[in-house]
Every structure is written in C-alpha cells, then in structure tokens.
Amino acid sequence: MTTSPFSRIRARIDQSPPKRVNEPGTWQAAVALVLVLRPGGDLELLFSRRAERDGDPWSGQMGLPGGRKEEGDDGLLDTARRETMEETGVGLPPDALLGELDDLFPNIRVLPPVVVRPFVFGLPDRPTIAPSDEVATHLWASLGTLRESARVVEIEVIGRKQEVDAFVIDGHVIWGITFRIVSRLMDFLI
C-alpha cells in the first residue's frame, strides 16, 4: 500500500516533537507552510513578498504567510490560519494540518523580539490567491527547485553587506528565518 506525501510528512513530524520557546518579553507569531501536491508528485510551497512599507522590518522580504498573534486568536494555530486568510485569501481547514515545527527566533537581533511557530499544511490543489495590500506578490516554488536553488548570496542587512544562506527563485531571494524554516521542513522529507 502506498501512502501520500502528506501522510508521510505528518508521520515524520509526529516522530519529532517540536522544540518550544517560552521567552518572556517576546512577541508570539505563527507562519503557515502551505504545501500543494503537483501532478508528477512534486510538492510546491507558497511564498509571499511583503509590500514595501515604512517602519516594517520585513518590508519587501519574501516570506511565508503569517504574523503576530492577536488578542482574539485562540492560540498560534489560529494565528497562522487567520494571517494566511488575511494575506492570501486561502482558507486552511483543520484536516489540512500536517504538524508543527520548532519555534525559532530571527537571527538579526535588531528586529522586534519575536518567536515564530511554523505550522505545515497540505492542500490537494493550488488555491486561488487573493492577496491583501500587505502582500506585493506571491510565488509557488517546488521543493525540488528550492533544493537546487540553495546557495550563499550577498545581501544588505541594516546598511551592511553580508553573506547568507538563501534560496533564489525567479530572482526572489528567500533567506533568514524563512530559509531556516523551509530547510527544517525539507529535513522531514529526506
């Protein structure tokens, strides 16, 4: 009997309980890794490029749908679902949840003190995207293409050039905490 890629991902994530960070004085945030199974069996992942906004430390960056937990959210899973709906118009039903990954901090310490919890979802088909004004564009990238595109690139961070690990897809640079989250997901697929 064959199992679906989503069943395998769920089983692998279940075997490795996520590490949690409970750091006083930090914001809590959540992101959604939205996977879609393509014909031929490859998995694609949804990314968004944030709109350019003054005062937004992630302005113009490629990332995953998500954001800060709000008072009305019933936990971080609710945050991931709400933010994904707000930013992309994509609803994430309960049965689409495949699991949770380790909590992470951004490595750049001048950013707001935030702990990000990644949630992995699997959808049977590519949903229609209806981006909000928070999102400049979106991108679907196959995991195979992401693997092949991984490299070290030079970027400017807070006025300084530095080399970082990144995925480079169609001219979009995916680095930082997003690179680390996606790399962790790929660890479950090896």
Language-model-detected regions and their locations in the chain:
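N-terminal leader/linker segments that precede catalytic domains of diphosphate-processing enzymes
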Residues: 1-63, 68-127, 144, 156-190
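Acidic, glycine-rich loop-and-strand cores that form catalytic or ligand-binding grooves
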Residues: 131-139, 143-145
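A mid-sequence, solvent-exposed acidic-amphipathic segment
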Residues: 146-154
